[in-house]
Amino acid sequence: MDESSELGGLETMDTLTELGDELTLGDIDEMLQFVSNQVGEFPDLFSEQLCSSFPGGGSSGSSSSSNSSSSSGSNSRGNGGAATDPGVQRSFSQVPLPTFSPSTASPQALALQVKVSPTPPRATPVLQPRPQPQPQPQPSAQLQQQTVMITPTFSTAPQTRIIQQPLIYQNAATSFQVLQAQVQSLVTSSQVQPVTIQQQVQTVQAQRVLTQTANGTLQTLAPATVQTVAAPQVQQVPVLVQPQIIKTDSLVLTTLKTDGSPVMAAVQNPALTALTTPLQTGALQVPTLVGSNGTILTTMPVMMGQEKVPIKQVPGGVKQLEPPKEGERRTTHNIIEKRYRSSINDKIIELKDLVMGTDAKMHKSGVLRKAIDYIKYLQQVNHKLRQENMVLKLANQKNKLLKGIDLGSLVDSDVDLKIEDFNQNVLLMSPPASDSGSQAGFSPYSIDSEPGSPLLDDAKVKDEPDSPPVALGMVDRSRILLCVLTFLGLSFSPLTSLLQWGGAHDTDQHPYSGSGRSVLSLESGSGGWFDWMMPTLLLWLVNGVIVLSVFVKLLVHGEPVIRPHTRSSVTFWRHRKQADLDLARGDFAAAAANLQTCLSVLGRALPTSRLDLACSLSWNVIRYSLQKLRLVRWILKKVFQRWRATPATAAGFEDEAKSSARDAALAYHRLHQLHITGKLPAGSTCSDVHMALCAVNLAECAEEKIPPSTLIEIHLTAAMGLKTGCGGKLGFLASYFLNRAQSLCGPEHSTVPDSLRWLCHPLGQKFFMERSWSIKSAAKESLYCAQRNPADPIAQVHQAFCKNLLERAVESLVKPQSKKKSGDQEDESCEFSSALEYLRLLHSFVDSVGFVTPPFSSSSVLKSALGPDIICRWWTSAVTMAISWLQGDDAAVRSHFTEVERIPKALEVTESPLVKAVFYACRAMHASLSGKGDGQQNSFCHCERASGHLWNSLNVSGATSDPSLNHVVQLLTCDLLLSLRTALWQKQAGASQGLGETYHASGTELAGFQRDLGSLRRLAHSFRPAYRKVFLHEPTVRLMAGANPTRTHQLLEHSLRRRTSQNTKHGEIDTWPGQRERATAILLACRHLPLSFLSSPGQRAVLLAEAARTLEKVGDRRSCNDCQQMIVKLGGGTAIAAS
């Protein structure tokens, strides 16, 4: 028996060896996974269930079944042919146990019978799907389970894993040992003992581990746990493991590692899902043996400790399944990311082909940017097409209205759109939200200054069936037709003929019926004066009733009224807000389209043909004339109040009518502003006049609903439109509307806004009516005024008026106007005082421009985009500082220099050389006031820098927006630099210099003076008034250089001679010197020319006295003091000479 068993074992080992050469661990693992995936596929395979139970101590039970016999036979063959007694075999019922946690596990468990299938003798076992058994509880049966702890590790850190697996232990004597319920320990010897662990195919969901004794008796394993802990010195015991396919609920798989890290593995639930052979590492060889009967045996090294561990110290928790490795997760993530990237790249390529074509080459960000730009372009095109479609639908609706078809569609229908379309497209026509947090249900652009409008709130929109016919209004052609018919009816009234026929019939009541002739006679009537007055009174009464009815029809019932919170009102406010946004952005074409849509919704569409324009213009002229008659207004108001049933209804309807008139007036006013400023394609003059009259008429009808400032703006805009469009033909109408606007300001101009206060001044009115200004030219950037609103004609005219005041102030300094008559020269106004008066007015008008106002405020229509004009204020301060320095007012120079020193950002950005020249000239004037020694040197340095910038400004070519203002500013700057250099030279000469003596200047001073004089000569070629300064400063440079005094005296004589305006050619008067130039020339001649050049000593004194009077009248205190000192010196010398 022993030899046969040994031979059988060797054959089995040879078969396992041959099978191991053909199969690998991966193949076996793949087969096991395949079988594990088939769980639940065949539920009827193990439908046979046995219900017999057995006691836990190894007591006998019922007789075994055929499956038990085959199982015993298989075991005997596996043991080398040892026979077993079939009567001793036991049969067990196959009952799965429910899964329980270690904390709730008890030592006693339910008993179950295992159906053991024999292992056929084949090289490769055939894998078949196993059904999942049905659980049947066995409350009486109890058994215990035994656990073997295997301690391999996978990582460097010690880890503990517990695996519970059913094992059948077979000793060397080919007999099975019964594992007892108590705690046991496996101790290895110094020699490696082969241990064979045979695992049978288990197909029960929850099964117990059975062992077979030497006599073939199978016993259940108790739930005792055997723990093996690897000591520091561990010996490997090769264990033969027969891998079988086991389907249970859970399994924790572990492998062995070569290091000695203790890993505790246990299976709390004996129901195993699969069992695979341990993975083979680099240092661990797992040989696989195949027996003769096809049994696969695998040796697995097991590290076993030498000490017993109590069961209480065994950890009861069961670790979860080991998560997938980091490398596997990373690989899966990379695959998914690669798919995502591929999909995104494909879509970007497709987007590039759609937007730029297949041949274009561009990176991904460029493709997305181009796509976004193209989408925005499509949105804009779609918006414009939608607007055009809306206008066409409204025009079609207007034609239907004229034909008497679908009269109620303009009131409560959204421009011939269905209510469902309105609800679907409610967000398409609304302006974009200002930020992402704005609610989509309300308009983010509603304001408090205007009446609330339910732009997007359907709950506030009234679904009224139809408005009264009075809300529809009449078109202008119908109004004119009614007026013409009324005029013809009154001119050719049939009532007059009827009354005359009735009187003739009364006189012929008793005619003569006989034959013969009758004599004409006059019969006196008995009625008296009542007979002939009654028909006349009756005729006038009937005609008055007819005319009054026509007025009521035209001015009350014929006016379109839009009820609040209706579909038409919602549409109007949506386009109105969008127009305001377009105006703020500068998209004037889109703003005009939205305003035209607003007027169409209000029932006041713009005329599209010449006939419509003629009828509309005629009706507005008639209406404006009727509104000026107070009797007509009073009668209409009384009739309107009587027409309504109750006072509350009349007041509500009157308020709605005024609100509709106000909205229409503002829309007409804004369209008129866009037309006269040239922001829209050029239209006819009649169209501009028509819009102006519509705005004025409706604004007057709105009465208190429209603010007074807006009403004044509407009249001023109408005046500007008539002046620019009609010119001299209808200039009286422009003056009429200007006077009308001034009368609206009140007697003391209390209600006039600050931005319009300049028109109440006589200079402003004169500039408005007499000066030629253009508002259709594109708004150019100016060095002298800040940028105004390009769509506001009043702001542009105000800008032109400010520049005109600045030009007048500078011209009064460099080009004083002389009187025509020589006798008036003494009474000529001082040039300094005139300049200061202009600058004072300019400063007040600049401050009254007004601050920034809300763009959607109904009280301000297209206000200026800026507050006070800081640029014009800076120029005002600079010119005032120059006048103060010329007058010798040092305190005023210092006070104004603090304002000039803060140059505005807008002027710094321009990098204009003229601005820099003026700035450094002001710094030079301020430095010259310093009493220190370096003050004159600093002033000289600033003069040099200002001279360089002035020369550059003269060399700048190209058209400028204000050429005349540039010339006078350049002339003033050049004159200031030359005067400043002369003053510095005279200071260096000192008080020790006597009369007739000359102090020669240095070469650097002469070079700077000659450079500025060259700039003055160059400016004189294009600006003739500069010659008067040339004749004054050329003698000065000759005196500084010590040149021939004869030529110097001849040049001074040009400024000293008196001239009259008689017999002078045109343009020569501009070259005549003014009073200040003549006084300055007298000072130079009397101080620096030799005494021999004057004819007599008395002549010098007379000239100095005249110069002192002139300088005192001008206000030049510094030069006047110098003149008086010279008179004192000259008086002493004259007395000595006379004695």
Curated annotation (Swiss-Prot):
Domain bHLH: 328-378
Protein name listed in UniProt: Sterol regulatory element-binding protein 2
Family per record: Belongs to the SREBP family.
Region (Disordered): 48-104, 119-143
Disease implicated: Sterol-resistant defective (srd) phenotypes express truncated forms of SREBP-2 protein, often found fused to other proteins, as is the case in SRD-1, where SREBP-2 is fused to an out-of-frame KU p70 protein or, in SRD-2 where the fusion protein is a LIM domain-containing protein. Srd phenotypes are resistant to sterol biosynthesis repression by sterols.
GO biological process terms on file: cholesterol metabolic process; positive regulation of cholesterol storage; positive regulation of transcription by RNA polymerase II; regulation of Notch signaling pathway
Ranges of biased composition (kind: Pro residues): 119-138
Description of activity control: Activation by cleavage is down-regulated upon activation of SIRT3-dependent PRKAA1/AMPK-alpha signaling cascade which leads to inhibition of ATP-consuming lipogenesis to restore cellular energy balance.
Extent of Low complexity compositional bias: 61-77
MF-aspect GO terms: DNA-binding transcription factor activity, RNA polymerase II-specific; protein dimerization activity; RNA polymerase II cis-regulatory region sequence-specific DNA binding
InterPro entries: bHLH_dom, HLH_DNA-bd_sf, Ig/MHC_CS
Entry annotated with the keyword Glycosyltransferase: no
Swiss-Prot/TrEMBL site (Breakpoint for translocation to form SREBP-2 fusion proteins in srd phenotypes) positions: 460-461
Gene: SREBF2
Modification type Phosphoserine: residues: 1096
Residues in the Lumenal compartment per record: 501-531
Domain of life: Eukaryota
GO cellular component: endoplasmic reticulum membrane; ER to Golgi transport vesicle membrane; Golgi membrane; nucleus; SREBP-SCAP complex
Ranges per topology, Cytoplasmic: 1-479, 553-1139
Region Leucine-zipper: start-end pairs: 378-399
Site (Cleavage): 466-467, 482-483, 520-521
SMART domains linked: HLH
Region (Transcriptional activation (acidic)): 1-50
Region (Interaction with LMNA): 235-489
